[in-house]
Amino acid sequence: MKCFIGGFMPIITTQDFTEEGRLQIGTFAPDIGQPAENVLVRISYSGDDEILEEMITDASGQTPVINLPAPPIEYSMELTETRPYSDYDIQVIMDGYRPMIIQGVQILPETTAFQDIRLQPENNNSVGERIVSISDHTLWGTFPPKTPEAEVKELPPSTGYVVLPNPVIPEFIIVHDGRPNDASAPNYWVPFAEYIKNVASCEIYANWPQSTITANVLAILSFTLNRVYTEWYRGQGFDFTITSSTAYDHAFSYGRNIFEEISTVVDDIFTSFITRPGIRQPLLTQYCDGKNVICPNWMTQWGSKTLGDQGYSAIDILKSFYGYDIYLMQAQRVQGVPVSFPGTPLQTGSTSEYVRIIQEQLNAISNKYPAINKVRVDGVFGPETRRAVETFQEIFRLSADGIVGFNTWYRISHIYVAVTRIAELS
């Protein structure tokens, strides 16, 4: 949420790319429930036809992780007039599907970027290349500042929509890709955690301290869940959850790459939000960059980075900006998953009905992701189950420890739902 006040912002040239970031591409047809194998992937500098890398996706729809040139890390540690990331174009080609180009994939030094691509079948209504252009990062580009709002909303009167007594994590966020009254802007249905990862990748740099990333993710979560809980836009007659306009909400760039350093944090805490004593709803935790826009009593992104550098924890960073009476809560219900996390990690030696559930789900997922071995469904967490969990974690970019904790449980649930939906459609 920022607005650059100033003149020309120079773009660093490729000769100055003295460091590296990493990139992995995942391809799906049409979504994560169906990986796309043998897709031709080409990478070039943005606006340049010269191909830097050419790869083929594996049975999980993924390319190897590759290193790509990036600017010096100093440019993302302090506000400068030089863009702190390099950008690339990705072209994907697969028989029977529309060729696709992702323009402006952002690579930060000392980070790993993930670019997932959803392919569309060729038909009479969709021909030619499909192009997705990623917006500038908000800390470097020009964006309107946030219009201030009250952090606690009056709940709307009953209009047919049910305001739940306690915050719930929705399965999807409906993002209006523009200002609220722009009827020409499309709406996108985005899985909740995927939406949070997209926003955070737009709003902060992934090579910042982990406590800074966590604090900013918590603010994004709380803001978003306030919009969900209060039915803010539906109460005004709109058919979406939130917008992509920084004047009203967060930045969101459809189809953009996310970063591993942000993704890991989101997977660990996506049910958490910020609140105050005596308040049931998540706070509308507004923020700005703190350099080009000043926002008293809100978190500043660059200020949170400074505190992270000084060793502050995520909650102490948040309290420094929003007040020392704030605290964290967790939503107890996640929509769209068959069974909630049991509360205790499952690992070698565990025996329970929850182990049986994970075994059944992993077997279903392995029908589409054959690198995952089949397991006996017996409720006993043995070596076969551990190996299947580790392979799942490797494919879906989680720490491959073979333990089904909070993040792995919900990731397995999410992929299981996607895979079974594809099977039903088939």
Which residue stretches match the model-derived regions?
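Short coil/turn motifs at beta-sheet boundaries
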Residues: 18, 34, 83-85, 110
